[in-house]
């Protein structure tokens, strides 16, 4: 399941970059560690605010983390953080 998540996240990052969102480089091998770190902290993921401004939060790590295909990869705190960030930014499911 992790491999599918990483592939999906890398594809979403690529799509975000194509619409002008600048993201820090990330190696696929570090993706899960980066995802857990981003979702367990208080800061939004890389590019979240810009994606919100562009109304493309579907490309965010937070949206991917609450996707039913991948919820098993994250603990309750991480999933709740992702959900609260999305709801606070006005994301519609």
Question: Across the structure, where does each feature detected by a protein language model lie?
Answer:
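General helical secondary-structure elements
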Residues: 8-9, 33, 65, 81
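Charged, low-complexity surface patches
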Residues: 15, 40, 75
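Amphipathic alpha-helical binding modules
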Residues: 54-93
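Alpha-helix boundary/N-cap detector
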Residues: 3-7, 26, 73-77
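Charged, compositionally biased N-terminal leader segments and the immediate start
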Residues: 1-19, 83, 87-89
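Amphipathic alpha-helical packing elements
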Residues: 10, 18-54
């Amino acid at each position: 399941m992790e491999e599918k998540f990483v592939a999906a996240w890398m594809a979403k990052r690529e799509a975000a970059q194509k619409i002008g969102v600048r993201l820090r480089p990330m190696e696929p091998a570090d993706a899960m560690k980066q995802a857990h770190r981003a979702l367990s902290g208080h800061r939004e993921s890389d590019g979240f605010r810009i994606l919100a401004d562009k109304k493309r939060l579907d490309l965010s790590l937070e949206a991917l983390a609450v996707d039913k295909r991948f919820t098993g990869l994250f603990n309750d705190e991480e999933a709740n953080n992702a959900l609260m960030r999305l709801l606070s930014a006005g994301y519609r499911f």
